[in-house]
Amino acid sequence: MSTLFVNNLNTASGSTITVPTGKVVVGTDGGTFKSPGQIIQTVAAEDTTMFAQGGTSYSNTGLELDITPKYSNSKILVCVREYFTFRTAANTERQADFRLLRLVSGGSDVQVAFQRINQWTADSSTAHYFGKMSAYDKLDSPATTSAINYRTQCKLNASSADLFVSHDSAICTMVAFEIAQ
């Protein structure tokens, strides 16, 4: 067996390099072949533990994942789906704020996505429960090959309401795709 050492492959003519029938080009790891737009890796997380939030300061919901990009110029597509129940007895508008944070190893939290969900209740005689979904996708450009933690937080805009994320063990999910550039 021979080993060929080259830095670039190019065609003598035309624009196609052909591997003969019955022959296979084998890569030794998942990053051997890279083309723009290709998914390099996928990391997924789910959470079914109910998180109750009744305050106006951000708190972690419990949904998070870690990904270590293979290339510093990769984009990371983060898809978040969090089911929650909004409980309020106030006859006014209440807002639930959700955000996605990125923490690169050795750095500080950076908010990379934000979503506000409104709820209006006309009857204040009793508490009402409203099922809602916080769903968003964020194409992030972290510019690193260090470990990244993505996590979600939520808060209320005012008191007299509660959020129950993953209420009744509903599955909340986060999926991160590293996309080659």
Where do the language-model regions lie?
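Terminal beta-strand-rich extracellular "head" domains
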Residues: 46, 51-52, 57, 69-147, ...
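Short, surface-exposed loop/turn motifs at beta-strand boundaries within globular domains
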Residues: 2, 38, 58-60, 71-73
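Short, polar loop/linker segments at the starts of domains and inter-domain junctions
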Residues: 17-21, 52-65
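Glycine-rich, low-complexity segments
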Residues: 3-51, 181
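Small-residue-enriched segments and motifs
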Residues: 4-7, 65, 98, 174
